[in-house]
Every structure is written in structure tokens, then in C-alpha cells.
């Protein structure tokens, strides 16, 4: 009987750990960093994208000002980008931009938008913009310059 109980507990523990792993893997989504189709910038490195989104780089080659588009705070895509690209949470990100603004290093903060449709609309309206979308929201109106994670 004790062997049966041990095996039952072991099987239940394995089942629980498998469901936990499935829940974690569901959290891993591919986020694509995108620019308008008309923007001819080549593929970008993670570091280049990080510098652009952190307002450390503010213009494309040729001098055109970069407009950074972010999902609004609380959105899943934003949390993934903050975690995977910046290694920050929302509080750290906010603190970074408050400090940058107070020291004069910040030329223009990213524009927070509520949805993928709004990001795509802004990208369509501004050839110098950069943003991100969940892979499933990417269509032929944008060009992917980096895939996360």
C-alpha cells in the first residue's frame, strides 16, 4: 500500500509540474519589432532597438527623427518587451524616463497606444516610426526588423 501511495503522489506531482510548464510556455510569445513598410532601415540588432526605445538614439541614418510607439502600461505585449528587451519592469521603465526627462537627456518620450490597431495606424501615418506587435498582428503593412525573444 505505501508503494501505491508513493507512486500516486509522484504521478500527481509530475502532472502538476507539466501543467505549470505549459502555463509558462504559453506566456512566451513572439513580439516583432516593426517599422512601416516604406521605412528601408535594415534588420536591427537587439542593442540598436534597445537604444532607440530608451531614447538613446533618436534619428535614423539620414537624420530623420524616430518616433517610438509602445503599448500602454498594463498591456501584455508591453510587459514582454520590458522584460525581454530592457530587462526592466514597468516601475523601472517609468523611473528611467522620469530621470531622463529631468536631466534633459530625453528628447521625446515613447507614445503609448492602447491596441495593435492603433500601433499599425500610427506606423502607417509616420514613415519614421518604430513599434512592436505580437507576431499574430503583423501584416504586410509593416516590416519586421527584429524578433523577440
Kindly label every feature range from the protein language model.
Residues 1-9:
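Bacterial N-terminal signal peptides that target proteins for export
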Residues 8-19:
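Bacterial N-terminal signal peptides
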Amino acid at each position: 500500500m505505501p508503494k501505491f501511495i508513493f507512486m500516486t503522489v509522484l504521478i500527481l506531482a509530475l502532472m502538476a509540474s507539466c501543467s505549470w510548464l505549459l502555463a509558462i510556455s504559453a506566456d512566451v510569445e513572439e513580439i516583432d519589432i516593426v517599422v512601416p513598410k516604406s521605412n528601408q532601415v535594415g534588420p536591427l540588432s537587439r542593442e540598436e532597438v534597445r537604444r532607440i526605445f530608451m531614447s538613446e538614439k533618436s534619428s535614423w541614418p539620414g537624420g530623420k527623427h524616430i518616433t517610438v510607439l509602445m503599448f500602454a502600461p498594463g498591456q501584455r505585449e508591453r510587459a514582454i518587451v520590458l522584460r525581454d528587451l530592457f530587462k526592466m519592469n514597468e516601475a523601472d521603465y517609468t523611473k528611467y524616463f522620469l530621470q531622463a526627462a529631468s536631466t534633459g537627456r530625453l528628447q521625446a518620450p515613447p507614445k503609448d497606444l492602447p491596441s495593435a490597431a492603433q500601433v499599425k495606424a500610427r506606423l502607417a501615418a509616420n514613415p519614421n516610426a518604430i513599434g512592436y506587435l505580437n507576431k499574430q498582428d503583423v501584416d504586410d503593412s509593416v516590416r519586421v526588423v527584429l524578433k523577440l525573444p
